[in-house]
Amino acid sequence: MLILYIIGGILILPVIYNLLFPLKKPELNNYFKTGQTYTSTGEGITQKILRQEGNKVFCELTLAPHAAGPPEHMHEHMHETISVVSGTLNYKLNGKEEQVGAGGRINFPAGAYHKMWNTTNNEVVLRSEKPEDFVPVEFVYSLDQLYPLMQSNGLTLKMFAKICVLDELFDSVPVGPPPVFFRIIKKVVKPYARIFGVKP
């Protein structure tokens, strides 16, 4: 019985905390400047801001030679499209591996697990070239917050706490846990992370 009370308390606290102390989302209008860059050395990716139009951000991604790229993941609400400007990119979409070269296009639909990486000795450059290639500003902001943690600490508890506090701003679900389970875990961990000073 005591264990049930403890579990109940752990699950109820997030609800109470979020009602009493609602999280204020960051103000992201005109947040990014043209030419601004941020890098994930662990993934071998540098992103450069081309422009921000309201809540839409257009970027250029450069994958270093032999870049591992991000872990396999999917976006529940975001479609990801981008053009290959130079180099040859390897990617995986719903379990199937492919390659695409300069002049090609990538389309990762919402809900589709995917990954991209570079197996060559040359850089691969991807760019938002069409109107539909925008990335939601909340997602780009989340990457801007997470990349320094990945750079210095790798996949640590601190980084996971940050992901939980960012919550729906960071529309990314790693391969493995069911999306609904991942959402619940983030909701449970978020108030505890906020108590310890983690901010979005």
Predicted regions and their residues:
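A cytosolic small-molecule/anion-sensing beta-strand core signal
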Residues: 85-86
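Short, well-ordered beta-strand segments enriched in hydrophobic/aromatic residues
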Residues: 57-63
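Jelly-roll (double-stranded beta-helix
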Residues: 1-46, 50-56, 67-72, 76-78, ...
